[in-house]
């Protein structure tokens, strides 16, 4: 379920910390925006002339003068200031009038008395009126979204704006590449107007003090090329390390979430001509292709078999022969792509270019799940005669919880010997109990680190393999179940640190995320077989997908962390010996930062993602002699748009449930009045290790609800979510949904008790894991707090979801049958106690299968429960996009919620026909 908070990415806040890990083809996917980055840099250099750049953080207008507050007391204070401003204008007017000497003092006193009596009577009448209104049932006062008060020129956030991406901040990605001779600060630039199609720029040329820089280098002059009379257009590009060739993918066809098929071509930079990757199979659909670090060969997978093409010869060498429907080589199957690698590659070159590590996946025992397509034919194949009216069925090997997993082996290929071999190491897991989650080559040493866990992800083994000697050993073994009862998250952030005795590093080593006193921190293991790390970070905070980069020249490690707050992100550095911890970003103000470093860590693209308008700049790191800063994106258009619209007031605070402090954000309507009674919608995701409450900027569906409809929207990250310590995270193990639902309910009770909340109009909604949590909360609450719920693509029984994700948090069903019974949505009588709920699902969902919703409907039918609505979307997967479906999802949520808070569903329980007026017949 990796990445699910972003299923509806255009509607959610940017860079919530479920950021997906980059796959091996990240260069191709990001190169196209680098041109904009470099154009911005060039514009600023031209504008500044010889002016020396500084590292000053640019200041940008906030989303609104009072759009943010840290707690309720701060917000009340701000509202009082607003009222004082209004009173001061009146005061000034009255003062001017009081200077008129001609007004008799007695007359003036009489006027004041009469005015006071009038105002007192008006206030009393208003109080009586409001008092009567307060006792009206919500259904008697329908909410009119168009009647939300508006002052001045402020506009409401609209659904069209949100759905159309108009509130998305412009954000550029940089494709940093390493030069052929190790140069740092090189960018791959693709598709820039007025420039050649694919070029390499040197960011160092933008610094007046830079020396030894490279001239702009053209890799591809045009955005098209010809091979054997065919005109081809690049979809993805992968330059060789020596920058003499470009591997080009065309005719890309999507497979699963990350993987795709394509035709590949080798483009020669000098001659500007191309040839097919495989000269004897021009139309072969290749699943994955990657360069040798020495730029002299390409390894690729086709039809689940691996091949090697050396540039010195047109001949393609077949590495494996038994790949097919049940055996995968070098690419992951569905569950490994989704839950382990979050990418399309299971192939790893060593830096010397002499060896390739790759995964062999055996799916022969994995059951198949049929995904049906009733409208489209994703295979692209015409049906057989007579089968035109039957749906297309795609059988996917999908291991559900407790079912047989694919078995995996790590194999190696010796290029000089053209030999595949395996290194067996004693003390490992049984094949049916083994997950291989990460492979990291130790540079050019011929050694590799392999991270393995058992099936339930609570026992970790790190293995060091020497492929030259063809031997290996276990260097770390940790039973996390004994440590805190939790699990190991999948990670691919381990960083190899080569030995450099002259620079204070006598041995090779690696940096890994470790558990230290309830939090995730960085440890430096050196030598590589040392099981006790040098602790680089510590404290009641966590590192996030760290390290971000390592400056080997200066022994500096860069990382993002939650040191200032669980809901912010700042960039820090620390020395390899664990000393000299420094903040790189300005921690005196709140910020939610991301960073993308150049290959040598001398430069970084710094992304400020909130709480105010996002911006980006390229800066040199502190140890770089060529110091400069260039802003590449300010999002002025977004800032102007924010000024013209009335955005929700965001109140960040915490609640304590069962001794755990939980992060909450409340989105109030722009003209919030504490004397009114507001409906409240809770929005959640809540998956293990996820985070929804953050200080990142985002105007999404929740913002629309608060701004346009005038409802309050609350999000609480309950137990099980990330960045608040492992104790709060791991308490859910074996019983997911229980504590998370309790946290939603207890927080909702706090809101229900607030004077400005209409406790009879409270709803909750979520997608994917959030859909499961919506139903689980309604089930546990049984109508006591929440009256309504909306669940999109929900899991309803964790026995239906994939094994690797589910068993990490629940163990296997064989190990924990009672836990699976508890977590399933089965108490439908409790669901019947809610006023009404809505369920929506994509019929072709290959992730959370439609089986989940259909099984729930059957339970509801058996129990005679009818207080719900259902909408299914033909041929839509988990993101629900097919044939305008995504817009329908949000229109449905919008209209259904308005009807709920208008009390429409209160009138459906015992519907009676209207009397027929004979006069109108």
Curated annotation (Swiss-Prot):
Q: Where in the cell is it found?
A: Vacuole membrane
Domain of life of the native organism: Eukaryota
Query: Can you tell me which residues are glycosylated?
Result: 362, 822
Catalyzed reaction equations: Release of an N-terminal dipeptide, Xaa-Yaa-|-Zaa-, from a polypeptide, preferentially when Yaa is Pro, provided Zaa is neither Pro nor hydroxyproline
Query: Would the keyword Heme turn up in this protein's UniProt record?
Result: no
Q: Where is the composition biased (Low complexity)?
A: 23-33
Q: Does the keyword Protease apply?
A: yes
Parts of the chain that traverse the membrane: 110-130
Active-site residue numbers: 768 (charge relay system), 845 (charge relay system), 878 (charge relay system)
- PANTHER family attached to this UniProt entry: DIPEPTIDYL PEPTIDASE 10, ISOFORM B, PROTEASE FAMILY S9B,C DIPEPTIDYL-PEPTIDASE IV-RELATED
Q: What role does it play?
A: Type IV dipeptidyl-peptidase which removes N-terminal dipeptides sequentially from polypeptides having unsubstituted N-termini provided that the penultimate residue is proline.
Q: Spell out the family assignment given in the record's similarity comment.
A: Belongs to the peptidase S9B family.
Its recorded name reads: Probable dipeptidyl-aminopeptidase B
């Amino acid at each position: 379920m990796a990445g699910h908070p972003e299923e509806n990415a255009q509607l959610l806040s940017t860079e919530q910390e479920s950021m997906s890990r980059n796959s091996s083809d990240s260069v191709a996917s990001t190169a196209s925006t680098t041109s904009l980055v470099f154009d911005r840099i060039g514009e600023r250099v031209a504008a500044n002339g010889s002016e020396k750049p500084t590292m000053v953080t640019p200041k940008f207008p906030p989303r609104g003068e009072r759009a943010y507050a840290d707690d309720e007391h701060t917000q009340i204070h701000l509202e009082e200031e607003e009222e004082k401003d209004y009173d001061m204008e009146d005061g000034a007017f009255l003062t001017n009038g009081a200077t008129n000497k001609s007004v008799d003092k007695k007359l003036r006193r009489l006027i004041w008395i009469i005015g006071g009596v009038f105002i007192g009577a008006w206030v009393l009448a208003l109080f009586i009126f409001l008092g009567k209104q307060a006792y009206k049932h919500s259904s008697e006062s329908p909410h009119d979204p168009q009647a939300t008060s508006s002052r001045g020129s402020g506009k409401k956030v609209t659904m069209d704006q949100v759905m159309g991406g108009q509130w998305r901040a412009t954000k550029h990605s940089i494709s940093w590449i390493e030069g052929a001779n190790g140069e740092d600060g090189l960018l791959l630039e693709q598709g820039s107007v007025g420039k050649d199609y694919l070029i390499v720029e040197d960011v160092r040329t933008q610094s007046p003090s830079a020396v030894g820089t490279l001239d702009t280098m053209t890799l591809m002059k045009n955005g098209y090329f010809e091979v054997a009379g065919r005109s081809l257009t690049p979809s993805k590009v992968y330059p060789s390390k020596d920058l003499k060739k470009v591997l080009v993918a065309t005719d890309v066809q999507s497979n699963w979430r990350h993987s795709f098929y394509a035709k590949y071509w080798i483009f020669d930079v000098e001659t500007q001509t191309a040839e097919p990757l495989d000269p004897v199979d021009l139309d072969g659909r290749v699943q994955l292709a990657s360069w040798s670090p020495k730029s002299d060969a390409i390894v690729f997978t086709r039809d689940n078999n691996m091949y090697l093409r050396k540039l010195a010869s047109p001949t393609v060498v077949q590495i494996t022969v038994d790949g097919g429907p049940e055996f995968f080589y070098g690419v992951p199957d569905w569950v490994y792509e989704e839950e382990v690698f979050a990418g399309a590659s299971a192939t790893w070159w060593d830096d010397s270019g002499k060896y390739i590590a790759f995964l062999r996946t055996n799916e022969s025992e994995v059951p198949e799940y049929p995904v049906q397509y009733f409208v489209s034919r994703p295979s692209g194949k015409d049906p057989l005669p007579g089968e035109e009216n039957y749906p297309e069925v795609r059988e996917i090997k999908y291991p559900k919880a407790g079912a047989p997993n694919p078995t995996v082996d790590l194999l190696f290929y010796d290029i000089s010997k053209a030999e595949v071999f395996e290194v067996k190491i004693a003390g490992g897991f049984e094949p049916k109990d083994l997950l291989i989650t990460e492979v990291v080559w130790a540079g050019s040493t011929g050694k590799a680190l392999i991270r393995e866990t058992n099936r339930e992800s609570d026992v970790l083994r790190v293995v060091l393999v020497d492929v030259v000697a063809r031997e290996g050993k276990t260097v770390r073994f940790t039973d996390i179940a004994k440590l805190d009862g939790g699990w190991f998250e999948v990670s691919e952030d381990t960083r190899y640190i080569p030995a450099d005795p002259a620079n204070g590093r006598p041995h090779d080593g690696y940096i890994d995320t470790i558990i230290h006193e309830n939090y995730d921190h960085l440890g430096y293991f050196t030598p590589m077989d040392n099981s006790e790390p040098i602790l680089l970070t510590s404290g009641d905070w966590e590192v996030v997908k760290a390290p971000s980069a390592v400056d080997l020249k200066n022994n500096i490690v860069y990382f993002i962390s939650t040191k200032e707050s669980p809901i912010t992100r700042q960039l820090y550095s620390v020395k390899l010996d664990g000393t000299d911890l420094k903040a790189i970003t300005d921690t005196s103000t709140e910020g939610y930062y991301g960073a993308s470093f150049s290959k040598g860590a001398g430069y970084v693209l710094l992304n400020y993602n909130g709480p105010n308008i996002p911006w980006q700049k390229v800066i040199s790191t502190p140890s770089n002699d060529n110091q400069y800063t260039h802003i590449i994106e300010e999002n002025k258009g977004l800032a102007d748009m924010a000024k013209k619209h009335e955005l929700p007031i965001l109140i960040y605070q915490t609640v304590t449930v069962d001794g755990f402090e939980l992060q909450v954000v409340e989105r109030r309507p722009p003209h919030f009045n504490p004397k009114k009674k507001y409906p409240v919608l809770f929005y959640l995701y809540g998956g293990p290790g996820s985070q929804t409450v953050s200080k990142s900027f985002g105007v999404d569906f929740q913002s629309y609800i608060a701004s346009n409809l005038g409802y309050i929207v609350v999000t609480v990250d309950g137990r099980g979510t990330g960045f608040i310590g492992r104790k709060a995270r791991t308490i859910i193990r074996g019983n997911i949904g229980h504590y998370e639902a309790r946290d939603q309910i207890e927080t909702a009770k706090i809101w229900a008790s607030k004077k400005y909340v209409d406790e009879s109009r409270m709803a909750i909604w979520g997608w994917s894991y959030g859909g499961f949590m919506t139903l689980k909360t309604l089930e546990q609450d049984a109508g006591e707090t929440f009256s309504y719920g909306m669940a999109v693509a929900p899991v309803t029984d964790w026995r239906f979801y994939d094994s690797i994700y589910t068993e990490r948090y629940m163990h296997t069903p064989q190990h924990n049958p009672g836990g699976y019974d508890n977590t399933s949505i089965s108490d439908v009588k409790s669901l019947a106690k809610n006023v009404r709920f809505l369920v929506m699902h994509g019929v072709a969902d290959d992730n959370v299968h439609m089986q989940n919703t259909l099984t729930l409907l059957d339970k509801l039918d058996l129990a005679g429960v009818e207080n719900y609505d259902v909408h299914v979307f033909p041929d839509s997967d988990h993101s629900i996009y097919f044939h305008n479906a995504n817009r329908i999802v949000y229109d449905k949520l919008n209209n259904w919620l308005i009807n709920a808070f208008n009390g429409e569903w209160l009138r459906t329980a015992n519907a009676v026909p209207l009397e027929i007026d004979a006069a109108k017949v």
